[in-house]
Amino acid sequence: MDGEKNECGREQGAREGETGVCGGAAAGSPDGLDRIRELLRDDTRLVERVVGETRVWDGKIFRVRTLDVALPDGTTGYREVVWHNGGAGVCAVRDGRMCLVRQYRVAMGRMSLEIPAGKLDAGEDPAHCAARELAEETGLVAERFEFVARSAGSIGFTNEATSVFLAHGLSAGTARPDSGEFVDVVWLPVRDVLSAARAGLIQDGKTIIGALAAVERDLA
């Protein structure tokens, strides 16, 4: 993948520290970002070192492991973790309305409204995944994808993280949902989506991130 370009025209593999190029919102101050980078460097007073790993289960989507870790105070600890390739979601906005997928989430036991999204294939560039899922679930095609953020939803036990993009230059096509995928596509005002999030009706993190990014860029 080194040297290849993604849909943003940017080299792949720069997930950590991406700054929302492709026409994104203004970045924070250089001094502020340097301070945050310093805070995120490994600190021997806090780091847990993996000294053993046990395979529990390998599934189609994720892998479960138990880890033995050496703690900073010299004792050992036990962690249960889930390894996952991660995913990508895309916020598509047209005339102040954002495209959402309406579907049933059996793990939550409820209906859900979410931006189009899907799992990364091994080694896949997130922008490529975002383009694929947008086309499959909604039929929409975008001229470019602007990186917004990478969100780790359950950082305490899994490495799963979702890259969120804004789609620009939309055109309509034909949806091609995966076999066994039953969804409706709806367009809702961006600010209504945020109101629904505050009311606890929309709980999906990547969707909330996408809506906030749309407001930040005056797309709502």
Question: Where are the language model's segments positioned?
Answer:
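Conserved Nudix-box catalytic region and its N-terminal flanking loop in Nudix hydrolases
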Residues: 2, 21-23, 29-34, 40, ...
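Acidic, metal-coordinating catalytic segment for phosphate/diphosphate chemistry
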Residues: 48-89, 94
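Short glycine/serine/proline-enriched coil/turn segments at secondary-structure junctions
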Residues: 59, 107, 154-157
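Unchanged
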Residues: 77, 88-89, 94, 119-205
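Short helix-capping/linker segments at secondary-structure and domain boundaries
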Residues: 214-220
